[in-house]
Amino acid sequence: MKYFKLVIAFLLTVGIFFVLNTKLGAIPPIGKFLNPYSGVWQNETDETTTGIISIPGLKDKVSVHYDEQLIPHVFAQNESDLYKAQGYLTAKHRLWQLEFQTHAAAGRLSEIVGEGALNHDRRERRRGMAYGAEQAIAYMEKQDTETLGFIQDYADGVNAYIKQLDPQDYPVEYKLLDYQPEAWSPKKTALLLMYMTKM
């Protein structure tokens, strides 16, 4: 009888551990989501740092000032640094929105939210925004390298922010949907702009 209780307690513990760490349909792993170290509790505050910011690849000093409405004002010595800082700050405050909208534009939303978005994805793929974004980048590679350089600087800023994130620092939406951010690219910027003009 003593061993029977031990086996039952062990099986219950293993069962609870399994359930708390398994994605159940659209529900994220509850244990992972509620983990006090890396779960949703880490998303309590969003710091806004006024002053000099440090981003890999900057040529000169870049400063950011947040006004009373928490709108960042970026001051840079050159355009390349300005676009890197803008990408970094946009990712800091809107990373999930950036990625979700580019997935929606490219017809990849079902990768994040499941089969319920398949009709949306098919419609967007027929619309051809991903192809249009590729063509826009190809045109810039041949005809407008300056703009492409700025778009690459913006992507570098977004990626600098993504690279510094640990899983516990991911925005809460990533934790809810149980996935991680992808690297940003100029194509994603073109997709985002095309998607915004569609709205």
What kind of region is each of these model predictions?
Residues 3-10, 15-199:
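Substrate-recognition/specificity elements adjacent to catalytic centers across diverse enzyme folds
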